[in-house]
């Protein structure tokens, strides 16, 4: 692969403006002066040297957020006032869409078409959605069975820590920050160390939008230091995390050991995509590929276990192979490209090791399975067939461009096998039979089930997992619940003039 084919010239030409921490409305160096490098996954070259926040920097950010919450205007503004600022924030995201998308491309490796025309739209619209909720947070009046009356207040929980992963930094920033701000909370954000650039640019836009100082704070750094400080901080009132189940467990332990702060977790997945024998084979193959190869397979919801009815297995595999081979890999800034490099070297090597393990355990490698080009963390879109449930690639989350096909006979069998996982994030069903669709939908233990589609996400649809895929919901009005507390106010009604 030539340098032009992997986006090298575009990466080097881009001027990265923000590399420091963002605390109390200002870009500042870390207290220790420590820095780290962020790498372009397409070129393996350094994009920028970024300030490295540690425990003392997190503490400074929390103090700013606490002051902004306890004594600042944000939680005391009317919902209408917060709405206007969040709408301005959304407008600025839209106006700076090219710059945000470029940062996302060079920091994550995803194709520009996805970053610019899919995820950037989701990001701005998520802020608009929760802006619309800011002035609609209300309590209830309660009629008690005694000489008292009561009503409830739904109040912001306080300072929230957000730990954001590297696969979709702009969109996940919006998913976490927008509802927290709409509720009246202040936030401390720890972006992934592999993708710090988007969060810093979003912090800059928040200042332009009129978000008061201290309401949004961004501390770049590593999970073992900055992330651990967020999850264990005694003055953070709640925390959210998207990432691996292993790290999610660590965050829960830290939250419990500190101040028992509530935690919302969106964790790993090994989602089933079930194709019944009445499905449109061509459409099912297209959706199956979309459900795994989108974002280079770096999707928590990837429907990577593709269960196919034995009656259409051979025909489906043939169509699936052709679809995978047509998934264009190359220059991330080329409009035709659908597949870029894995985000980082560690993930690249992990995916390749799973591919080798799949071959060793007896799965049939149909296409792909090798590095692509001579530079960058590119892996060919990969398809395995003759996969069985006990194989490691069928049980563990790979988080890469690897599709595996498994054969089934009956609806009862496939439901049992689909549920035979510690995860429960999502599932897909392809069938023309409404009875089959309803039966499987109600039997699958997963937070999202897509029928005759996949990845059909929307601002109004709650998203989250069952089992070890986590708990709590993002998107939809349900997302607000993690950022609000209910207070009950009770008063006597003796001698009231209306009695």
UniProtKB/Swiss-Prot annotation:
One of its GO terms (molecular function) is aldehyde dehydrogenase (NAD+) activity. This is Aldehyde dehydrogenase 1. PROSITE patterns: ALDEHYDE_DEHYDR_GLU. InterPro entries: Ald_DH/histidinol_DH, Ald_DH_C, Ald_DH_CS_GLU, Ald_DH_N, Aldehyde_DH_dom. It is an enzyme of class 1 (oxidoreductase). Expressed in flowers and disk florets. CDD domains: ALDH_F1-2_Ald2-like (cd07091). The keyword Metal-binding does not apply. Belongs to the aldehyde dehydrogenase family. The gene is ALDH1. PANTHER family: ALDEHYDE DEHYDROGENASE-RELATED (PTHR11699). Pathway: Isoprenoid biosynthesis. Signal peptide: none annotated. Its EC number is 1.2.1.5, 1.2.1.-.
């Amino acid at each position: 692969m030539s340098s032009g084919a992997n986006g090298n010239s575009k990466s080097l030409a881009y001027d990265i403006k923000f590399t420091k921490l963002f605390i109390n409305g200002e870009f500042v160096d870390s207290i220790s002066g420590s820095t780290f490098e962020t790498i372009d996954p397409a070129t393996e070259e350094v994009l920028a040297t970024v300030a490295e926040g540690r425990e003392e920097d997190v503490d400074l950010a929390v103090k700013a957020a606490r002051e902004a919450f306890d004594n600042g205007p944000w939680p005391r503004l009317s919902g209408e006032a917060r709405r206007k600022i969040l709408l301005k924030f959304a407008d600025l995201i839209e106006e700076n869409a090219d710059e945000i998308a470029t940062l996302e491309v060079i920091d994550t490796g995803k194709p520009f078409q996805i970053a610019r025309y899919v995820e950037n739209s989701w990001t701005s619209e998520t802020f608009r959605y929760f802006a619309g909720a800011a002035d609609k947070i209300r309590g209830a009046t309660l009629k008690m069975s005694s000489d008292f009356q009561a009503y409830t207040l739904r109040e912001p929980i306080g300072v929230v820590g957000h730990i954001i992963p590297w696969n979709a930094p702009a969109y996940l920033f919006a998913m976490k920050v927008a509802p927290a701000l709409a509720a009246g909370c202040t936030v401390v954000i720890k972006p992934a160390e592999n993708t710090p650039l988007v969060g810093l640019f979003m912090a800059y836009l928040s200042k332009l939008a009129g978000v008061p100082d201290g309401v949004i704070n961004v501390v770049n750094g590593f999970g073992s230091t900055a992330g651990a400080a967020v999850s264990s901080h005694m003055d953070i009132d709640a925390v959210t995390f998207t990432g691996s189940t292993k790290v999610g467990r660590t965050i829960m332990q830290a939250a419990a050991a500190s101040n028992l702060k509530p935690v919302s977790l969106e964790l790993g997945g090994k989602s089933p995509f079930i194709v019944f024998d009445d499905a449109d084979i061509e459409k099912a193959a297209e959706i199956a590929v979309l459900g795994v190869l989108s974002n280079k397979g770096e999707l928590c919801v990837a429907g990577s276990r593709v269960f196919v009815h034995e009656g259409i297995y051979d025909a489906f595999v043939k169509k699936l192979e052709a679809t995978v081979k047509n998934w264009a890999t190359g220059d991330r800034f080329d409009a035709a490209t659908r597949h870029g490099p894995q985000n980082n070297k560690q993930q690249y090597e992990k995916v390749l090791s799973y591919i080798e393990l799949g071959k060793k355990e007896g799965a049939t490698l149909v296409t792909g399975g090798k590095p692509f080009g001579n530079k960058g963390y590119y892996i060919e879109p990969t398809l395995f067939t003759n996969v069985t449930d006990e194989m490691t690639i069928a049980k563990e989350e790979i988080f890469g461009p690897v599709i595996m096909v498994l054969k089934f006979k009956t609806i009862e069998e496939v439901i049992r096998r689909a549920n035979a996982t510690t995860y429960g994030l999502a599932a897909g069903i392809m069938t023309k039979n409404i009875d089959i669709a309803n039966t499987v939908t109600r039997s699958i233990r997963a937070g999202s089930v897509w029928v005759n589609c996949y990845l059909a996400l929307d601002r109004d649809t709650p998203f989250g997992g069952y089992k070890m895929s986590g708990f709590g919901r993002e998107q939809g009005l349900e997302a607000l619940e993690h950022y609000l507390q209910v207070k009950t106010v009770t008063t006597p009604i003796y001698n009231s003039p209306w009695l």
